[in-house]
């Protein structure tokens, strides 16, 4: 801006308003800790869609629930997510089979090895059938082989088109040599590889595989030794659950593979409970995120209630965790079957969808879980009531309405002010928004002018929050108050280098129990 004006004319100048609006922070960023097919280990990676996840961490696997959970997260409306791959390396043993020859001495003919990973190859079948020899050329010998005939190999893999390799031979150098034809990288099989096992000196007739259908076996996937510390990790190395401390934008923590490790014998129940409590402790320490926990598999309502109340004793006084039951059935592309998995990944996606459509103040309940086929357990009304009282959020199937989440409680005590998920997450949102929006205050002169600006900015922000329906009250005076003055900042507080602002908020709470009183009346009667 010029200090003097010499030329006649109109001058338009920008003048700082002094207002620093507080913007709302994101509320739906999930962090997944678990097993994946590939990718960096113990290093957080951000993904925003399923394709990005596949490019970094691979596809679905048989020995982990994390890929299915993340797929369900995106399918249910999830957006940003952090993924931390934990655990040892996956050791894959391909399925294989030796095809027997026709010799009386039981000479093996061919070894068939699956190209599909691990146990997936166990579903491959190989059918051997004899074929007629081609007609003899004019003036020549029979087109059949003098020491053995030709055969057809049909390869069947579930969910794929059969592969047929006809007129095969075991004669070395033959254009239709079985090993060369099937193993051809361009025109050969996509499911198997062959290896000639017969020693030299054995006739073709004896080496030719016996005609029948064979099924491959022995395929498996296993993980090298896993200990709870692999899941828990530490902040310094940015590994495991503790490594999430370095990620400021995380609002949900999900670890479904704790249950997979338990099922596979890599963790005992004590280890499972210890890790779930470690996640709760992490969320309580960070005060800006909520843990979405899973119940163990195969438990009926009575068993899961006893487990939660007597065995696990999962409690979060500040409401920084939520527990869901039962497991859900989904399609598993890795096994090409339906499987039961922990619901936490799908739940995280539903939380995100609810935030996006209604706001973080809306309880993430009475909303449909997408991509879910069935439930491991169907609950009665009495069972639902008992579990709800003990802060176990249930998932129910409703005729004509799909499979829905039917609970919105945290792991806080029933009488706690942090009983509801939406209240806890609304306060997290408001706290983080004010924290980030008032960073400019640090080292400003601590006087009444500063207090007034802080009151103004926070009041404007909370007025917008109230306008979305997140706060209870017909007016802003009923919905909240902001106090930052001489009373909250006496001389001893100022001398200590502090500025104190007191904020009171009246959050909306869900209508958990809807009660209609209906009675008979006499026609024509008045109240």
Stretch-by-stretch model annotation:
Residues 106-197:
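Extended, Lys/Arg-rich, non-catalytic nucleic-acid recognition/anchoring regions
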Residues 25, 144-146, 172, 176-187, ...:
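Generic structural signal for beta-strand residues in well-ordered domains
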Residues 96-98, 167, 193-196, 203, ...:
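Acidic/proline-rich low-complexity IDRs
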């Amino acid at each position: 801006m010029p200090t003097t004006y010499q030329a006649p004319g109109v001058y338009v100048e920008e003048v700082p308003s002094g207002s620093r609006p507080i913007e709302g922070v994101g509320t739906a960023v999930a962090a997944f800790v678990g097993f994946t097919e590939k990718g960096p280990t113990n290093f957080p990676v951000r993904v925003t869609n399923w394709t990005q996840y596949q490019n970094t961490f691979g596809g679905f696997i048989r020995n982990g629930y994390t890929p299915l959970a993340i797929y369900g997260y995106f399918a249910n409306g999830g957006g940003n997510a952090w993924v931390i791959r934990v655990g040892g390396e996956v050791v894959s043993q391909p399925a294989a089979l030796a095809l027997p020859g026709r010799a009386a001495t039981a000479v093996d003919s061919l070894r068939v090895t699956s190209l599909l990973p691990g146990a997936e190859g166990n579903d491959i079948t190989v059918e051997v059938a004899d074929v007629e020899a081609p007609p003899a050329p004019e003036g020549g010998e029979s087109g059949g082989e003098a020491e053995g005939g030709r055969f057809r190999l049909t390869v069947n893999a579930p969910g794929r088109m059969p592969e047929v390799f006809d007129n095969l031979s075991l004669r070395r150098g033959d254009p239709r040599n079985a090993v060369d034809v099937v193993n051809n990288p361009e025109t050969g099989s996509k499911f198997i590889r062959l290896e000639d096992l017969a020693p030299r000196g054995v006739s073709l007739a004896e080496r030719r595989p016996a005609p029948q259908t064979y099924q491959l076996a022995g395929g498996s996937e296993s993980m090298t030794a896993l200990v709870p510390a692999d899941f828990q990790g530490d902040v310094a190395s940015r590994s495991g659950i503790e490594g999430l401390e370095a990620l400021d934008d995380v609002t949900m923590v999900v670890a479904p593979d704790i249950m997979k490790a338990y099922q596979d014998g890599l963790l005992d129940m004590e280890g499972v409970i210890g890790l779930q409590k470690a996640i709760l402790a992490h969320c309580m320490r960070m005060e800006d995120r909520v843990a979405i926990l899973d119940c163990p598999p195969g438990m009926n309502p009575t068993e899961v209630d006893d487990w939660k109340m007597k065995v696990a004793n999962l409690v979060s006084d500040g409401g920084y965790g939520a527990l869901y039951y039962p497991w859900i059935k989904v399609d598993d592309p890795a096994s090409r079957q339906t499987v039961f998995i922990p619901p936490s990944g799908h739940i995280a996606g539903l939380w995100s969808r609810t935030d996006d459509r209604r706001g973080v103040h809306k309880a993430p309940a009475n909303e449909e879980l997408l991509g879910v086929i069935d439930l491991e357990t169907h609950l009665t009304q009495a069972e639902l009531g008992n579990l709800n009282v003990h802060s176990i959020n249930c998932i129910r199937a409703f005729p004509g309405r799909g499979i829905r989440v039917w609970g919105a409680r945290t792991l806080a005590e029933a009488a706690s002010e942090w009983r509801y998920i939406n209240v806890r997450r609304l306060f997290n949102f408001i706290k983080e928004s004010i924290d980030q929006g008032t960073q400019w205050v640090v080292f400003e002169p601590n006087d009444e002018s500063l207090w007034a600006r802080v009151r103004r900015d926070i009041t404007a922000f909370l007025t917008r929050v109230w306008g979305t329906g997140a706060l209870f009250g017909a007016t802003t005076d009923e919905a909240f108050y902001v106090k930052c003055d001489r009373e909250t900042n006496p001389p001893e507080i100022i001398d200590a280098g502090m500025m104190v602002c007191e904020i009171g908020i009246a959050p909306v709470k869900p209508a958990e129990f809807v009660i209609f009183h209906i009675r008979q009346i006499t026609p024509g009667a008045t109240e």
